[in-house]
């Protein structure tokens, strides 16, 4: 008798992706983040759907509707904080997932990597638009500052900004369209995830050694389904500790003040996961230059396959590259810290140095160090 799992047109797709998928036998816990990102996306879509049932995208009632969700809707506070902190967990997993890709040379899967970078951009856009929806002070001023960056584009900039706003300032039209986009983009993300997986399964997974592992593959189920469940439990535990004990830990107190176009908050800053890019943006005195640096700080990820000059794929056996990688991580943490600080004397200089270092490590130091390691192989 034929196995339905292997013959049914629909079930066999799931089978080839999650059950009988040949997987390297030595992949570590760093490979758990793909499935955790899938879980985060499901959590965000579900909690977001229930929030959308009670939210109103009108400037007069948006803030009140959030209050209504937290006070009057059954477990509304839980859904709201799971959604807000779920975004933070999403970005933690994203950064670790990208970091894993950089460390182990997964970027040599060109299509998978580039779709991953597109996914990162779309997730960042979605998170930004979601932050505008509660219509607090930081929502309003964050939307004003970030959308205003597009006015730096020569010739069409101002027209483009007013077109996005739907008027001459961030107002009702802006909020309504941001809600529409924020609702639809996660489904586009889900579609892109399918393409991401499609390309990944063409080549198979990378592994910590960076070597071809065709001779030593094991089925995904039960080995990695069990392993993923551990990650799932840890993620849910971390999320629920955050939600139930300190739900506002990562938020901004300014967002509990309703949006007021007449008073600017003392320090306009985005959510923590955008601070590194925000620091790079602020460190350049020129508006257009800052915007280009901001975009390039993420877009630079697409250059990694081209900048890979090492004879080895993974950094597992490359101690000098490992040092450079951890310098880069430390630099990103420094940028994140600077992004949350006011624009004052020591922070401006630190931000500028950290921004220069970020691009120098990626474009110059990593390739040079890789070439040195290639030479050392011959000794």
UniProtKB/Swiss-Prot annotation:
Binds 2 heme b groups non-covalently. The keyword Nucleus does not apply. A ubiquinone binds at residue 201. The chain crosses the membrane at residues 33-53, 77-98, 113-133, 178-198, 226-246, 288-308, 320-340, 347-367. It is a multi-pass membrane protein. It holds the Pfam family Cytochrome_B. Heme b b562 binds at residues 83, 182. It is found in: Mitochondrion inner membrane. Its cofactor is heme b. Its main location: mitochondrion. PANTHER family: CYTOCHROME B. Heme b b566 binds at residues 97, 196. This is Cytochrome b. One of its GO terms (molecular function) is metal ion binding. The cytochrome bc1 complex contains 11 subunits: 3 respiratory subunits (MT-CYB, CYC1 and UQCRFS1), 2 core proteins (UQCRC1 and UQCRC2) and 6 low-molecular weight proteins (UQCRH/QCR6, UQCRB/QCR7, UQCRQ/QCR8, UQCR10/QCR9, UQCR11/QCR10 and a cleavage product of UQCRFS1). This cytochrome bc1 complex then forms a dimer. InterPro entries: Cyt_b/b6_C, Cyt_b/b6_C_sf, Cyt_b/b6_N, Cytb/b6-like_sf, Cytochrome_b, Cytochrome_b_C_euk/bac, Cytochrome_b_N_euk/bac, Di-haem_cyt_TM. It comes from the Eukaryota. The keyword Iron applies. Component of the ubiquinol-cytochrome c reductase complex (complex III or cytochrome b-c1 complex) that is part of the mitochondrial respiratory chain. The b-c1 complex mediates electron transfer from ubiquinol to cytochrome c. Contributes to the generation of a proton gradient across the mitochondrial membrane that is then used for ATP synthesis. One of its GO terms (cellular component) is mitochondrial inner membrane. Signal peptide: none annotated. One of its GO terms (biological process) is mitochondrial electron transport, ubiquinol to cytochrome c. Keywords: Electron transport, Heme, Iron, Membrane, Metal-binding, Mitochondrion, Mitochondrion inner membrane, Respiratory chain, Transmembrane, Transmembrane helix, Transport, Ubiquinone.
């Amino acid at each position: 008798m034929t196995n339905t799992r292997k013959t049914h047109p629909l079930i066999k797709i799931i089978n080839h992706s999650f059950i009988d998928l040949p997987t390297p036998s030595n992949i570590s816990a760093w490979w758990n983040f793909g499935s955790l990102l899938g879980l985060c996306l499901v959590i965000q879509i579900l909690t977001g759907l229930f929030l959308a049932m009670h939210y109103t995208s009108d400037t007069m009632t948006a803030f009140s509707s959030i209050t209504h969700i937290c006070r009057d809707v059954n477990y509304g506070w839980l859904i709201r904080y799971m959604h807000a902190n779920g975004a933070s967990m999403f970005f933690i997993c994203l950064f670790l997932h990208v970091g894993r890709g950089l460390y182990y040379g997964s970027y040599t899967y060109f299509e998978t990597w580039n779709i991953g970078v597109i996914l990162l951009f779309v997730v960042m856009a979605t998170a930004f638009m979601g932050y505008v929806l509660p219509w607090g002070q930081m929502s309003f001023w964050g939307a004003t500052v970030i959308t205003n960056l597009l006015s730096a584009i020569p010739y069409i900039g101002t027209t483009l900004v007013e077109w996005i706003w739907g008027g001459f300032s961030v107002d009702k039209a802006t909020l309504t369209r941001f809600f529409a986009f924020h609702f639809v983009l996660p489904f586009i993300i889900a579609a892109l995830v399918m393409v991401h997986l499609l390309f990944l399964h063409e080549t198979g997974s990378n592994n910590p050694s960076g070597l071809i592992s065709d001779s030593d593959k094991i089925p995904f189920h039960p080995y990695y389904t069990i392993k993923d469940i551990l990650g799932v439990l840890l993620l849910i535990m971390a999320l629920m500790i955050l939600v139930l004990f300190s739900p506002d830990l990562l938020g901004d107190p300014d967002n509990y003040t309703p949006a007021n176009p007449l008073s600017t908050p003392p320090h306009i800053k985005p959510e923590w996961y955008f601070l590194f890019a925000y620091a790079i943006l602020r460190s350049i005195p020129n508006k257009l230059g800052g915007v280009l640096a901001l975009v390039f700080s993420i877009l630079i990820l697409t250059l990694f396959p081209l900048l890979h000059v090492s004879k080895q794929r993974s950094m597992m056996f490359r101690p000098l590259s490992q040092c450079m990688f951890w310098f880069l991580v430390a630099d990103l943490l420094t940028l994140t810290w600077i992004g949350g600080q006011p624009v004052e004397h020591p922070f401006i200089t630190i931000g500028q140095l950290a921004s220069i270092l970020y691009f120098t490590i990626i474009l110059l130091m990593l390739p040079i160090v890789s070439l040195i390691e290639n030479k050392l192989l011959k000794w």
